[in-house]
Amino acid sequence: MKIKVITSYKPGTWEQYAEKSVRSVLENWPEGIAVNVYYEGQEPDNHWHPRKKYIDLHNVQPNLVTFKERHKNDPVANGELQEIPGGVRRLPEAGGMDRGKGSFLWDSVRFANKVFCVTHAIKTSIEKDYDCVIWLDADTYTFRPIPRDFLENLCPNNSMLTYLGRENPQLNDGGKYPECGFVCYNLRHPEIQNFARNWEELYTSDSVFKLLEWHDSYVFWHLSKIYRTEKNVAVNDIGYWKGVKGHHVFVNSELGLYIDHLKGKRKKLGSSAKNDFRPQKNSETQNLTQLDYWKQIPPTLK
């Protein structure tokens, strides 16, 4: 299986965490896996590696630039509350606990970058005979070597997508949008190019603003549910559908055997915390917290 890993970082974050993340992939992922790093308007750093390639996102995705220019001065499209004449509006029923607040949940401009990184990789990587593209957030850290068969088993041939879902099949409550710090896109699936095109169209047509939330994980969830229900597309949910527990589903899943995800406050802490973990039901992760890396992390988030 020919695999490409992609990530992106915004200006000012290379030294903070992205460099550590990218270096950890190059050091601990199997030889032969290409790493594409998308950058957003800034000059790329000077870290060179034969398997790493920098891509100017704005240069290769002009439709992204058009979308961002169209909405850059609209506070609502950037997650804020102030409405302007002719601007976009949140749906009246949107928000839940965040209703009436500024929130990343509606920051369409910020999170469009990630979407267009992924769609560019899907559209262009198949031409170079790649089998799958794996998105990995730039605030992850691969703390030990990953076997190739582990990655290949995560991305089965019959599934279009592998992701960390947060829909609990036992509760049947509709669930929550996935954790998209890791997503595998199967380039050999007959619907994957349509998926990428439809994802971009939600932004180029401004249809994204018809959804309850506008960040990439929610939009991904919205579109993947359409493909699952209307096109009967198979997906590989390695999160709640596999019995994983906890809000920090990334480290509680089998990915936690090799990778940490420093979401939010964890960036300042330098790792996830012991109280992020929940009892493990799956045999492959029974001894997860006994790994040397997890033994050394702080007990709680501060």
Outline where the language-model segments fall:
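Conserved phosphate-coordination/catalytic loops
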Residues: 12-16, 108-112, 211-214
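Conserved glycosyltransferase catalytic-site signature
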Residues: 18, 115, 139, 180, ...
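Short, hydrophobic/amphipathic alpha-helical patches that form generic packing surfaces
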Residues: 20-24, 119-120, 217-226
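Short acidic-hydrophobic catalytic motif
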Residues: 103
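GT-A fold catalytic core of metal-dependent nucleotide-sugar glycosyltransferases
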Residues: 106, 110-164
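Conserved catalytic core of nucleotide-sugar-dependent glycosyltransferases
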Residues: 143-208, 213
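Catalytic core and acceptor-binding pocket of nucleotide-sugar-dependent glycosyltransferases
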Residues: 182-301
